[in-house]
Amino acid sequence: MKKFLGLLIKKIYKGLMILVYRPKVVGRENMPKDTAAIVCPNHVHALDSTLIISMNKRHIKTLAKEELFRNKFFKFLADLYGIYPVKANNKSMESIKVSLKILKNNELLMIFPEGTRNGMAKGIKPKNGAVLIAATAGKPIIPIGIQGSFKPFTKVIVN
């Protein structure tokens, strides 16, 4: 029952994303169809991760700061979408181990190199975790650029 409910919620959510943000996906052919890779988008809005996950045919797992999991609704969605909690400013091996396990299982992993929304616009240099994990796992990095305001009924481009 939970699996059915999860699929139903994902379908409804994807429909809402298409209706409200009219995403245009460019370069979908660059996404690996059956091998592991790290997907690295810029981070412009709180809905970035779910937009990318919803618009991709293959499931993408991601990491999020553990404070977000205090919100019961977010935790529910995180369980549906395969979002794992990590300590945001902790240099522990926990997030690296989780990431390597995801890649070892031949799955896609999404990491936001900025570490925060609009990080580069704020002058924050991208973090090197994605490169470290890619080099350790021997997996490619797929860059993704998100353009748009995420204002309702405006187009968002995922490139």
What is each PLM-predicted segment?
Residues 89-92, 123:
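A conditional alpha-helix N-cap/helix-loop micro-motif detector
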